[in-house]
UniProtKB/Swiss-Prot annotation:
Transmembrane segments: none annotated. It comes from the Bacteria. The keyword Metal-binding applies. Disulfide bonds: none annotated. SUPFAM superfamilies: dUTPase-like (SSF51283). It comes from Shewanella frigidimarina (strain NCIMB 400). Pathway: Pyrimidine metabolism; dUMP biosynthesis; dUMP from dCTP (dUTP route): step 2/2. This is Deoxyuridine 5'-triphosphate nucleotidohydrolase. It catalyses: dUTP + H2O = dUMP + diphosphate + H(+). Pfam families: dUTPase (PF00692).
């Protein structure tokens, strides 16, 4: 069952100068977000900037959240990644989606108006409950942490 989530277009260039966000294929998990800036901007090496997307959101359903993820080509080809690595949008957030862009490369990068810079996807949320305990049952795996299961 699909839960309808309404995204509000708050920048009139979306749908006119630039296409509405869409899923590229029937199997696409995310849709691209664009840089809805007023003029092209240079992001210097190591600089982080906050970029408006022209889209506002209110998920409203507490069993869902939105996440903003990087586009692989931006990071691999240009060193442009999300400044916070992943943006988590809680169901009760209401407002414009902003993208924190970080230039991790050693070269300036020019972000043009309407460039696709991140992607948005929706995920289910399960909220945990807590129980105070005196002991915890062990398992075959045990408490091994990072790297415990090896690489082979």
């Amino acid at each position: 069952m699909k839960t309808p989530i309404e995204l509000k277009i708050i920048d009139s260039r979306i749908g006119n100068e630039f296409p509405l966000p869409a899923y590229a294929t029937p199997g696409s998990a995310g849709m691209d977000l664009r840089a809805m800036i007023d003029t092209a901007m240079v992001i210097e090496p190591s600089q982080t900037v906050l970029i408006p997307t022209g889209i506002a959101i209110h998920v409203a359903d507490p069993s869902l959240a939105a996440v903003i993820l990087p586009r692989s080509g931006m990071g691999h080809k240009h060193g442009i990644v999300l400044g916070n690595l992943v943006g988590l949008i809680d169901s009760d957030y209401q407002g414009q989606l902003m993208v924190s862009c970080w230039n991790r490369s050693d070269k300036p990068f020019t972000l043009e108006i309407g460039d696709r810079l991140a992607q948005l996807m929706f995920v289910p949320v399960i909220q945990a409950t807590f129980a105070v305990v005196d002991e915890f049952n062990s398992s075959d795996r045990g408490e091994g942490g990072f790297g415990h299961s090896g690489t082979k």
